[in-house]
Amino acid sequence: LDAFAKHEKAQLKMDVLGLEEGRTEYITLDPADHWDGATPTAVTRPAFLAIISSNSLATMLARKGGGGVQGFIIEGPTAGGHNAPPRGTMILNDAGEPIYGERDVVDLCQIAELGLPFWLAGGEGWPERLGKAKAAGAVGIQVGTLFAFSNESGFTAELKRSVLESALRGEVAVRTDPLASPTGYPFKVVTWSGDKDAGIPRKRICDLGYLRTAYVRKDKKISFRCASEPIDDFVKKGGDVAETTGRRCLCNSLMANINIGQFREEGFQETQLLTSGDDLTMIAEFLQGRTSYSAVEVVEYLLAGTVAARA
């Protein structure tokens, strides 16, 4: 960020499976390549807020030189999307979900001692949570689930209405799936009674590649593979067939959630795969019978606790 703010070339170390000892690969970007002789406009370096789920990572980032980070988003395992895996050996409950324990709880007192601002995320979408977060030393909270189903979000109106109607009937569930994501990280998957795509089989196609993994081929060149791509292709690229079990194509399905799912020559459109935080199962308390609401209503709801505390 320091380099880019000055329009200078920068690079990041690239994670590549199978690199021989002593070999390092980087991703490099030189902004000058894209200015085509023009004079770049002065920009301000943006703040870097790192999403973390452990004290050790926060401490390492806070002490890192070269500008480092300006704050933290402390995300718990109840948050939607990808979750950090439990520390230590992963143990699953009877529902096949990772079990999180005391080792996965971030010590907020230690975070506060680092002297950087932080926000809490995951299960924070309740009026009383903002006050509790501030009492613990946080600047505020990060809320995803409530905003994800608001009128202003990118989810299709049909999808939001279907989920909220199911939630009002108590017919929605959120599962932490240890296999769905090709990254290997646990991923929250929503199931609900009104899901029109439930049970529809999908042909394995990998053509977006946002979650692919870089690896070294036999000829020493770098290529990419994905555990959600066609199994034969993945294995031919040196992947372990066991890694393909239970994988879903997050790239295409998440695009379908926002109404830009691809249409295939075979005659089908990519189906949706919804992710959300655990609090979706309790959203009926906020809805109070509604099947739509605005982002403004969410903000007013979240601030109600602090307003009441000041009154």
Where are these regions (language model features)?
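Glycine-rich phosphate-binding active-site loops on the catalytic face of alpha/beta enzymes
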Residues: 1, 74-83, 127-159
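Hydrophobic faces of well-ordered beta-strands that scaffold small-molecule active sites
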Residues: 48-50, 72-74, 118-122, 141-143
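Active-site entrance/lid segments in N-terminal catalytic domains of soluble metabolic enzymes
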Residues: 1-113, 283-311
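Glycine-rich beta-to-alpha transition loops that act as phosphate-gripper elements at the mouths
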Residues: 50-56, 116-129
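Surface cap/lid and interfacial helix-loop subdomains adjacent to catalytic sites
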Residues: 102-113, 125, 135-136, 147, ...
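C-terminal extensions of enzymes
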Residues: 183-311
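Alpha-helix initiation/capping motif
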Residues: 54, 125-126, 151, 156, ...
